[in-house]
């Protein structure tokens, strides 16, 4: 049985909620505190498989989701705008889109600060010097300050995959080997 692709729906929902949260935080001068709460909640999601499953699960009722989110927020010390935001999201049964909301909020906040975000995939962890060199190179290309999020994926074998906005630069060894393999098939 094929599964429906809800990524576009999730993305639209996430962007609308993130935009509303950012506008409210900006009006109240609370962008930094909301960003800190977002980072804290994202860390909790990354550390807890149970929380990740709870957020993604459609099984729980809106009332159960709301009670759980209130308890989690209180225990984690999350209050103010972000705690109220989480309550609205739970009440509207949109917790499944929360990871996308966090990502969208970060992008909106970075754009507001005149920064852009780059997603970097590397075969191994980058040193601080390599990250700095990459930021400088990307700033030269984009003309804006760049924040990078590095993901380690050993399957790319070597090199980097850099995504900035809608552009992607793939210098991974895996891609180069795939290209070479295709070229050899065409020749022989």
Swiss-Prot record:
Would the keyword Zinc be found if you checked this record's keyword annotation? no
Q: Which GO terms describe its molecular function?
A: proton-transporting ATP synthase activity, rotational mechanism
Superkingdom of origin: Bacteria
**Topology relative to the membrane:** Peripheral membrane protein
Q: Where in the cell is it found?
A: Cell inner membrane
Report the PROSITE patterns cross-referenced here. Answer: ATPASE_DELTA
Keyword Metal-binding assigned to the entry: answer is: no
UniProt keyword annotations, A-Z: ATP synthesis, Cell inner membrane, Cell membrane, CF(1), Hydrogen ion transport, Ion transport, Membrane, Transport
Assigned GO CC terms? plasma membrane; proton-transporting ATP synthase complex
> Sorted alphabetically, which InterPro entries does this protein's record hold?
ATP_synth_OSCP/delta_N_sf, ATPase_OSCP/d_CS, ATPase_OSCP/dsu
Assembly with partners or alone: F-type ATPases have 2 components, F(1) - the catalytic core - and F(0) - the membrane proton channel. F(1) has five subunits: alpha(3), beta(3), gamma(1), delta(1), epsilon(1). F(0) has three main subunits: a(1), b(2) and c(10-14). The alpha and beta chains form an alternating ring which encloses part of the gamma chain. F(1) is attached to F(0) by a central stalk formed by the gamma and epsilon chains, while a peripheral stalk is formed by the delta and b chains.
The family assignment reads: Belongs to the ATPase delta chain family.
> Could you identify this protein by its name?
ATP synthase subunit delta
> From which organism does this entry originate?
Rhizobium johnstonii (strain DSM 114642 / LMG 32736 / 3841) (Rhizobium leguminosarum bv. viciae)
Lineage at the top is: Bacteria, Pseudomonadati, Pseudomonadota, Alphaproteobacteria, Hyphomicrobiales
Gene name of this polypeptide: atpH
